[in-house]
From Swiss-Prot:
Gene Ontology annotations for the cellular component aspect, listed alphabetically: cytosolic large ribosomal subunit
Protein family according to the UniProt entry: Belongs to the universal ribosomal protein uL29 family.
InterPro entries registered for this protein in UniProt: Ribosomal_protein_uL29 (IPR050063), Ribosomal_uL29 (IPR001854), Ribosomal_uL29_sf (IPR036049)
PANTHER family: 60S RIBOSOMAL PROTEIN L35/50S RIBOSOMAL PROTEIN L29 (PTHR10916), LARGE RIBOSOMAL SUBUNIT PROTEIN UL29C (PTHR10916:SF0)
Name by which UniProt lists this protein: Large ribosomal subunit protein uL29
Protein's gene: rpmC
Organism of origin: Synechococcus sp. (strain JA-3-3Ab) (Cyanobacteria bacterium Yellowstone A-Prime)
Phylogenetic classification of the source organism: Bacteria, Bacillati, Cyanobacteriota, Cyanophyceae, Synechococcales
Length: 78
């Protein structure tokens, strides 16, 4: 299973992005629970989900920063 691409995360809308973040966090929790109870057969999935979560959170923060930067720039221009 290849690493997810950040372009896929950037293609999501804000609402889809929030839903995907929630889903990945939930899946990561379940994987950690399986690991703690020694039921996890594919430990590499934890790494993949953490990587995907980091990408999603990066895109979310970029969008927030972009919106705040554009609003401060318009205030400075006035």
């Amino acid at each position: 299973m290849p690493m997810p691409k950040i372009a896929d995360a950037r293609a999501l809308s804000d609402e889809e992005l929030s839903q995907e973040i929630y889903a990945v966090k939930k899946e990561l929790f379940e994987l950690r629970l399986q690991q703690a109870t020694r039921q996890l057969n594919q430990p590499h999935l934890i790494r993949l989900r953490k990587h995907k979560l980091a990408q999603l959170l990066t895109v979310e923060s970029e969008r927030k920063r972009g919106k705040s930067l554009s609003s401060t720039q318009t205030q400075k221009e006035e």
